[in-house]
Amino acid sequence: MTPEKVFRIANTIVLLPWLLMMIVPHAEITKTVINSNAFPLVLAILYGFYIVKTFGKSGGNFFTLAGVERLFSKREVLLAAWIHYLVFDLFVGAWEWRDALQNNISHWILLPCLILTLMFGPIGYLLYFGLRVYFLGMPF
């Protein structure tokens, strides 16, 4: 399977849990899907496959920006990095969703955080964390 096809499949796989959290946050199907952790686990396995497949073959490193650039110059390494983003953004979004449900934070407050977490990862997390402190008066 080509990296392009795997990229499209991974992007499609990750949409279901995000849409469930955004559109039907209180539905049983959402609770089942998100609490199973199945989607991030499947993507993590895919990530692991590409890491094993490409490890040490790109000539790059994590010690300099130029080294990271060399790492990401290989399509399969870039694909692994993208899957890494998908897994961790989904993990953070699922935490936000669970925490909002547990603390009775309005879905209308949560929704922009989920969208930003999906699109810009840490920005959505930062917004959620700030709103959580504002509404609950506690960071954790």
What is the predicted function of each stretch?
Residues 111-133:
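Hydrophobic, aromatic-rich membrane-embedded alpha-helical segments
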Residues 1-10:
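N-terminal membrane topogenic signal
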Residues 95-107:
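Membrane-helix boundary connector in multi-pass membrane proteins
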Residues 80-87:
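Hydrophobic alpha-helical transmembrane segments of multi-pass membrane proteins
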Residues 29-49:
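Loop-to-helix transition at the N-terminal end of transmembrane alpha-helices
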Residues 47-57, 124-129:
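C-terminal TM-helix exit segments that contain a strictly Trp-centered aromatic cap at the helix terminus
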Residues 54-77, 90-94, 98:
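Membrane-helix interface/capping segments
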Residues 10-29:
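N-terminal signal-anchor/start-transfer transmembrane helix
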